[in-house]
């Protein structure tokens, strides 16, 4: 799976975290492992221009998705040709997201993770134009985000336990203990 991030926003953002959440969602949604995704982070002026050009709406927005193929919700972008399948592009506006995060009372990193999940779901054919679609998409979005956070917590726990075990086994003489 190839995920490329281009940060043109002028804001310091953890690209690794965006890649992590996008990779998690793509894998969880059973998309072909050779799929490709492009993410671009832009400033408010660029996002406002894209928003007007593609949605005919004034002002910036938080996230826009540009799928390569029109899919049904849950559809799989499996290319008949060998090689990777391009899902599309996700455009994020960190400055707009920062304002939303402040209003919601959570960190910018959480808002960007949420928007990344949202963007990937749009690429996979999900939408929220109708109430039933919104219920399905937002429910799935929240579940995927919760699952990703749980996965991160589990990985941190496992790493802490492994470090503790290595230290204890080193003291018992099973192998060299790391420097303390």
Curated annotation (Swiss-Prot):
InterPro entries: MetalPrtase_cat_dom_sf_prd (IPR023091), YbeY (IPR002036), YbeY_CS (IPR020549). Binds 1 zinc ion. Its cofactor is Zn(2+). It comes from the Bacteria. It is found in: Cytoplasm. GO terms for biological process: rRNA processing. SUPFAM superfamilies: Metalloproteases ('zincins'), catalytic domain. Keywords: Cytoplasm, Endonuclease, Hydrolase, Metal-binding, Nuclease, Ribosome biogenesis, rRNA processing, Zinc. One of its GO terms (cellular component) is cytoplasm. It holds the Pfam family YbeY. Its EC number is 3.1.-.-. GO terms for molecular function: metalloendopeptidase activity; RNA endonuclease activity; zinc ion binding. Its main location: cytoplasm. Zn(2+) binds at residues 118, 122, 128. HAMAP family: Endoribonucl_YbeY. Belongs to the endoribonuclease YbeY family. NCBIfam families: rRNA maturation RNase YbeY. Single strand-specific metallo-endoribonuclease involved in late-stage 70S ribosome quality control and in maturation of the 3' terminus of the 16S rRNA. This is Endoribonuclease YbeY. It comes from Rhodococcus opacus (strain B4). The gene is ybeY.
């Amino acid at each position: 799976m190839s995920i490329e991030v281009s940060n043109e926003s002028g804001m310091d953002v953890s690209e690794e975290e965006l890649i992590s959440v996008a990779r998690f969602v793509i894998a969880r949604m059973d998309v072909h492992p050779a799929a490709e995704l492009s993410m671009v982070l832009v400033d408010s002026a660029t996002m406002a221009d894209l928003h007007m050009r593609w949605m005919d709406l004034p002002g910036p927005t938080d996230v826009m998705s540009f799928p390569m193929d029109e899919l049904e919700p849950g559809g799989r972008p499996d290319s008949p040709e060998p090689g990777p399948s391009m899902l599309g592009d996700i455009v994020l506006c960190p400055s707009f997201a920062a304002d939303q995060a402040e209003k919601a009372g959570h960190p910018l990193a959480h808002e960007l993770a949420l928007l990344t999940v949202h963007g990937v779901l749009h690429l996979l054919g999900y939408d929220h134009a109708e109430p039933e679609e919104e219920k399905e998409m937002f429910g799935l979005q929240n579940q995927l985000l919760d699952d990703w956070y749980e996965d991160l917590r589990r990985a941190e726990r496992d790493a802490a336990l492994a470090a503790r075990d290595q230290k204890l086994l080193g003291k018992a003489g099973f192998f060299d203990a790391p420097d303390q």
